[in-house]
Amino acid sequence: MRARGAGCPAGLLAVGWLILVGLQASQASNVTSSGGGVQEPAVAREGESESESESEEEAENEGEVPESETTAEADAEEEVQNRTIVKEVEFGMCTVTCGVGIREVILTNGCPGGESKCVVRVEECRGPVDCGWGKPISENLDSARLSCVHISPENRFKYVWKLLKPDQQPVILTNDSAVLEITREIRPLAFECDTLDNNEMVASVKFTVYTTNELQMRRSSRPDTDAVLVFVLTIGVIICIFVIFVLIFIIINWAAVKSFWGSKTSATEIQSELSSMRYKDSTSLDQSPTDIPVHEDDALSEWNE
């Protein structure tokens, strides 16, 4: 009885142990199954995101083709517009014959207000570098002001002033501004100004600064053209005004003028007729005397018969 009683608890323990092992195994299988269930939606979501990204990439690739086409079309349109603009643009005359100046860019088509031409902008233009000999912008008996060739803005260019000496190298002055003021000395001086743009010479002009005595002599020896010009202009204006008044008088009194000229022409015609008649009478009276003896001879011959 004791052996059976001892065997029963051992069997119960074995059965309990097996049950616990089975429960642990079942729990482990549930965990693995639940993990697989969680992983499957994640994999599905990853697949969906990959498919969405692929569709977006395809859409982008499809959208890139028309963008390139549109850019090519836009470039072609810009080229055509540029060509038409070149054909429709004219350039005005440059404001200078040498050095650097400005000119107008004129549009001949597409102007606002239906105008045939309009100024689009103003741009820089350049002529020959050598401008020869210039004149001071202002001078008096004591000094003279010289100016280099430039346009606005003045500080855009670099200016190099030189003192010219015969048979010697020119002396570069320290002044680097566009205007140079010189005091007259006992001998005439010659200066040169070079205008540089990015170390490239765009203009060069020379000046002569005379002495005070030379300046006075030049002013005194200069013909008084101003007075002559004023006199000629005054006489011309007076003559023009007189002619205008005469024309106005003739237009207003055209009938009287016409009758006056008609009577005058008739009087001249009468005088011409009288003179022609007098000429005829004088020619008839001035016949040759040989005509009369001929008639007398005829009469005598008839009487003798």
Swiss-Prot record:
Its main location: membrane. The keyword Iron-sulfur does not apply. Testis specific (at protein level). Residues 29-231 are extracellular. Residues 1-28 form the signal peptide. InterPro entries: SPACA1. PANTHER family: SPERM ACROSOME MEMBRANE-ASSOCIATED PROTEIN 1. Plays a role in acrosome expansion and establishment of normal sperm morphology during spermatogenesis. Important for male fertility. Disulfide bonds: none annotated. The modification Phosphoserine is found at residues 266, 288, 301. Interacts with CYLC1; the interaction may be relevant for proper acrosome attachment to the nuclear envelope. This is Sperm acrosome membrane-associated protein 1. The modification Phosphotyrosine is found at residue 279. N-glycosylated. The keyword Transmembrane helix applies. GO terms for cellular component: acrosomal membrane; acrosomal vesicle; inner acrosomal membrane. Disruption phenotype: Males are sterile, while female fertility is not affected. Spermatozoa have significantly impaired swimming ability. The sperm head has a rounded shape instead of the normal hook-shaped morphology. The acrosome membrane does not associate normally with the nuclear envelope or intermediate filament bundles, and fails to expand along the nuclear surface. The sperm nucleus remains globular and mitochondria appear disorganized. Residues 49-79 have a biased composition (Acidic residues). Residues 29-81, 281-305 are annotated as: Disordered. It comes from Mus musculus (Mouse). It comes from the Eukaryota. Glycans are attached at residue 30. It is a single-pass type I membrane protein. GO terms for biological process: acrosome assembly; spermatogenesis. It is found in: Cytoplasmic vesicle, Secretory vesicle, Acrosome inner membrane. Residues 253-305 are cytoplasmic.
